[in-house]
Every structure is written in structure tokens, then in C-alpha cells.
């Protein structure tokens, strides 16, 4: 069976296929800083981290922001290891911590770089308290033993 993440407070759960899943879980916070837990399952590897809506990050890997907008993603190295990555969302269209153009409906996907990322500019421009009302698109890539597609 495809691994699924079921959690009563999950505001975002994405099934990425045979052995990949992602969930964003709201776990608390106050009026100015909401706290989320991120669970990612890639093959047999489980990745967990905590993020908040002010962009604070622990441990390194995922970044989200409410006023300054970030996207988060995972990448597969040529050796088959899962690598966490993040990108700032601004203007331009380059990869890896370079600003992106959020006026496009979808960000370009570079299969030669082996990335998947959030592809909804409307979602990224919203605060995370509103994200549960939006459609999320994820693009993922060839990993040893896993399929590829968007």
C-alpha cells in the first residue's frame, strides 16, 4: 500500500506515489507565529522537521515564511540519497536560493537538476494559515527505486 499520513490537524497531505508522501501539520503557535511539523517519506527514508510562519527553521532543510515567502523541497542526489533543499521566492527564475518569478502560474521544472518543488505561485504568496484552502501541486523526480512525474 502507498504510505499515507493521517493526522487530525494536518492541513496539507500529499501522496507522491508508490513510496513518497508529504504532510504539513499545524501543531500550535500564537497570533504572530504559527508552528508546523513537516513529515516527508521518500522510499524508506522518513524526514521530519519543525517550521514556523516567521521563517524560523529547525533543523536545516525546510523553510516557510508568511511575510517573506519561501518554498521548500527535497532533492535526490546522484548517489541516491535524499537531500533537503529550500529556495527563496522573489523575482527571477534561477534554482537553489536564487529568487524565482512568482508571476508565473507554475515554476519551470528542470529534470536534469533532479528537483521537485511547490508549483503553485498563488499558494506560496499566501500565508500558511490560508494554505489549506489552496490546491498544491508537487513535481518529483527519478530516484533509484522510485518513479518520476508531476
What do these predicted regions represent?
Residues 27-35:
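His-enriched metal-coordination microenvironments in redox/metal-binding proteins
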Residues 13-27, 73-85:
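Acidic/hydrophobic-patterned starts of short beta strands in beta-sheet-rich repeat architectures
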Residues 1, 47-56, 117-126:
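Beta-propeller fold detector
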Residues 1-19:
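Short N-terminal edge-element motif at the start of the domain
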Residues 59-150:
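Acidic, small-residue rich beta-repeat scaffolds with periodic aromatic anchors
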Residues 21, 36-37, 105:
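Residue-level detector of short, conserved catalytic/binding motifs and their immediate flanks
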Residues 25, 40-41, 109:
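Hydrophobic side chains in beta-strands
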Residues 35-69:
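Short helix-loop boundary/capping segments
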Amino acid at each position: 500500500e502507498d504510505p499515507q499520513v493521517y493526522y487530525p490537524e494536518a492541513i496539507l497531505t500529499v501522496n507522491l506515489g508508490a513510496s513518497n508522501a508529504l504532510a504539513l501539520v499545524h501543531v500550535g503557535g500564537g497570533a504572530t507565529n504559527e508552528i508546523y511539523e513537516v513529515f516527508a517519506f521518500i522510499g524508506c527514508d522518513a524526514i521530519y522537521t519543525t517550521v514556523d510562519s516567521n521563517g524560523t527553521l529547525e533543523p536545516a532543510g525546510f523553510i516557510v515564511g508568511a511575510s517573506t515567502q519561501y518554498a521548500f523541497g527535497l532533492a535526490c542526489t546522484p548517489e541516491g540519497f535524499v537531500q533537503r533543499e529550500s529556495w527563496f521566492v522573489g523575482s527571477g527564475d534561477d534554482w537553489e536560493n536564487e529568487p524565482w518569478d512568482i508571476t508565473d502560474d507554475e515554476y519551470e521544472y528542470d529534470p536534469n537538476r533532479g528537483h521537485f518543488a511547490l508549483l503553485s505561485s498563488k499558494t506560496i504568496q499566501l500565508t500558511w494559515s490560508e494554505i489549506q484552502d489552496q490546491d498544491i501541486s508537487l513535481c518529483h523526480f527519478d530516484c533509484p527505486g522510485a518513479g518520476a512525474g508531476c
